[in-house]
From Swiss-Prot:
The gene is SAP12. Zn(2+) 1 binds at C21, C25, C37, C40. PROSITE patterns: ZF_A20 (PS51036), ZF_AN1 (PS51039). Zn(2+) 3 binds at C165, C168, C186, H189. A zinc finger (AN1-type) spans 159-205. InterPro entries: AN1-like_Znf (IPR035896), AN1_A20_ZnFinger (IPR050652), Znf_A20 (IPR002653), Znf_AN1 (IPR000058). Zn(2+) 2 binds at C81, C85, C97, C100. A zinc finger (A20-type) spans 15-49, 75-109. This is Zinc finger A20 and AN1 domain-containing stress-associated protein 12. It comes from Oryza sativa subsp. japonica (Rice). May be involved in environmental stress response.
Length: 224
């Protein structure tokens, strides 16, 4: 339709340089389509015989031959072990598998066996020193004697504890009161004002208060 409209427009315009289709269909042709219109040129291409696919067949034949040759080479390389163990051998190992070839080298080559023997010998000769077990030191007889002497002295000191009042010499026994000045007194003379006490209670209290309430002083501010 577009070509017919173009032809009508050309005819109405008084003619042009475009030539008619060589098949005489009434449409215009061009040099690019061998003086045919687009429809006739497309039909001509469809009617033309296709070229035989010779090249793909040749490529397929070459690939098949190459795969056959590779398979044959692989079959030659994967020959069975000459020792008859059932595994595959190779030309590099005298047509033997790796295990049979290694056993063959061990049996025939003294260097191979001697190179492996020092390694085993060195591993077997290594000895690990074991540290002797440490035992806990037992207390000596001298220590026991010292402990017994200390216990005896403490019991003697307890037995020698005075059981009489220092002021009136009254026997107090275990009910005596010990003053901080070091003496033992009865219930009558147990207070500091009832006997000549030499202990400074005020000083002791001041030291105790100072110890329990330390003076906290903030550090001085350094001016720059």
């Amino acid at each position: 339709m577009e070509e017919q409209q173009a032809a009508a427009a050309g005819g109405g315009g008084g003619g042009g340089g475009a030539s008619m289709c060589a098949n005489g269909c009434g449409f215009f042709g061009s040099e690019a389509t061998k003086k045919l219109c687009s429809k006739c040129y497309r039909d001509q291409l469809k009617a033309a015989p296709s070229s035989p696919p010779a090249a793909p067949d040749l490529v397929a034949n070459e690939e098949e031959e190459a795969s056959t040759a590779a398979a044959a080479a692989a079959d030659e390389q994967l020959a069975l072990c000459s020792s008859g163990c059932g595994f595959f051998g190779s030309k590099e190992t005298n047509n033997m598998c790796s295990k049979c070839y290694r056993d063959h080298l061990k049996a025939t080559s003294p260097l191979f066996s001697s190179s492996s023997s020092p390694a085993t010998a060195s591993t077997t000769d290594i000895t690990v020193p074991i540290a002797p077990a440490t035992t806990a030191p037992t207390p000596s007889l001298k220590g026991k004697e010292e402990e017994a002497t200390a216990a005896a002295s403490s019991s003697a000191a307890a037995a020698a504890k005075p059981n009489r009042c220092v002021a009136c010499r009254k026997k107090v026994g275990l009910l005596g009161f010990e003053c901080r000045c070091g003496g033992t007194f009865c219930s009558t003379h147990r207070h500091a004002d009832k006997h000549a006490c030499t202990f400074d209670f005020k000083k002791s209290d001041r030291e105790k208060i100072a110890k329990e309430n330390p003076l906290i002083v903030a550090p001085k501010i350094t001016k720059f």
